[in-house]
UniProtKB/Swiss-Prot annotation:
Entry keyword set: Ribonucleoprotein, Ribosomal protein, RNA-binding, rRNA-binding
InterPro entries found in the cross-reference section: Ribosomal_uS11, Ribosomal_uS11_sf
Gene3D superfamilies tied to this protein: Ribosomal protein S11
Organism of origin: Korarchaeum cryptofilum (strain OPF8)
Name of the molecule in the record: Small ribosomal subunit protein uS11
UniProt GO MF annotations: rRNA binding; structural constituent of ribosome
Similarity-based family: Belongs to the universal ribosomal protein uS11 family.
One Gene Ontology term from the biological process aspect of the record: translation
Assembly and binders: Part of the 30S ribosomal subunit.
GO CC aspect terms: cytosolic small ribosomal subunit
Function: Located on the platform of the 30S subunit.
Gene giving rise to this polypeptide: rps11
Pfam families: Ribosomal_S11
Entry superkingdom: Archaea
Amino acid sequence: MSTERKGKIGVAHIYSSFNDTIVHITDITGAETLARYSGGMFVDADRLEGSPYAALKAAMAAAKEAQRKGITHLIVKVRAPGGIKSRIPGPGATAAIRGLSRSQLTLIRVEDVTPIPHDGCRRPHGRRGRRV
């Protein structure tokens, strides 16, 4: 049984926060950008930029453009803000993955690449923390 795939492989970098979702498709090396869309390009109100609907539209537009450029398979890398910010991807992450899988592109693997600090930067709000 052969594991070789016919067609070109691309990498879909999905950055999803609670304010916006960015779908960026590159070649396998990451050097050449094939398509880049954000949720804010498809909705009018600023508060809707991070919504699942905007992420779905952005992912489908990026997938269509990548297909035009010859991509047939995708490796998906999902990223949340990370660091001292949220380690949970926003609501648009799953919708963006759904939008990519709805297109004719084959998803090879989905992985989480959120940056996790190993005792790097100190969190804000001082020694006693945030007093509410």
